Amino acid sequence: MSTLEESPPDFEVDSAASAAAASRPRTIWQLLLYNPSVCFGGAVLAVMLLTALLAPFLGTIDPSNIAPIYRNKVPGTERMLRLEDGSEVPITHWMGTDMLGRDVYSRVLYGSQISLVVGLAVAILSIAVGLAIGLVSGYIRWLDGIVMRVMDGLMAIPGILLAIALMSLFNAGIGTVIFAIFIPEIPRVVRLVRAIVLSIREEPYVEAAISVGTSVPLILIRHVLPNTIAPLIVQGTYICASAILVEAILSFLGVGIPPETPTWGNIMAEGRILFQIFPHNLLYPGIFLAVTILAVNVLGDGLRDTLDPRMAKRLG
């Protein structure tokens, strides 16, 4: 009588499969941590944010302090600073001084505050306004043509030229700069949101909501708005990087933040005069500007790849 020998279950294969499944990222936060672009861009941007917040503590001297006898000093120059009580303390100009004797290091640190505030404010305002317009334009058909013609007209004008034109109409200041930069960014958000709405408007679950008498605002909030969150987060990073660059360009051209305010653009505008002799006045703010824009763009690329449902499906 023959007997059938049962093969033992392949615990090793099951264990390996379980381990592989356990090692895969399962939540959006795990997906973000598994993306090197998100980690790199986020880390650099976090350092820049901390630098901006801690500028009063990290700076060696008041950025507006003028000392003509110490003008155009090379990086690493040391000197004694006289305080209000008459005492003196040693300080080091880590990035040298400009043509008025102001500390470049302190001015660059304080300049990061302006750049990051402008970038974040423009991104938030552009997304808020563009989202509202895009939702209405994409869902209400008779408004779509009117809205898109206005958006096409705005996009036909180069953003930097439109920003300069808007700056010429108002007094210079950070609020005016934010307004002048965020207006040209609105069409980009509107077109993105409108495209998402058009792709969702004919979905069965939206038609079902319409058939049971759901109001248009409720449909937009409940069914359409959630689908725009991930693309808008990614778009917001690109708008932030663009706004930081445009603010620096406006200040560099002398039509942005007032010259006495320490911004990266203003510092570079002053440093270009003696760039061939004292390059540090332009070099250091330029490095901070380039690194910040690079970090924001890399973060945006990482978020785009991570929040893409197709990639999330492959990784999960």
Regions from the language model: what does each represent?
Residues 56-64, 138-143, 171-172, 197, ...:
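Transmembrane helix-loop junctions in multipass membrane proteins, especially transporters and channels
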Residues 155, 167-171, 181-182, 195-197, ...:
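Glycine-rich helix-loop "coupling/hinge" segments at transmembrane-helix boundaries
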Residues 56, 130, 134, 138, ...:
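Juxtamembrane/transmembrane-helix interface segments of polytopic membrane transporters
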Residues 45, 107, 148, 152, ...:
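Residue-level recognition of transmembrane alpha-helices
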Residues 1-127, 131, 135, 160, ...:
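Gly/Trp-centered helix-boundary motif
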Residues 17, 21, 97, 139-142, ...:
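Residue-level signature of the cytosolic catalytic core of signaling kinases
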Residues 104-109, 136, 150, 193, ...:
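Short hydrophobic alpha-helical segments within the ABC transporter permease transmembrane module
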Residues 94, 120, 124-203, 207, ...:
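Generic hydrophobic transmembrane alpha-helix motif, especially the helices
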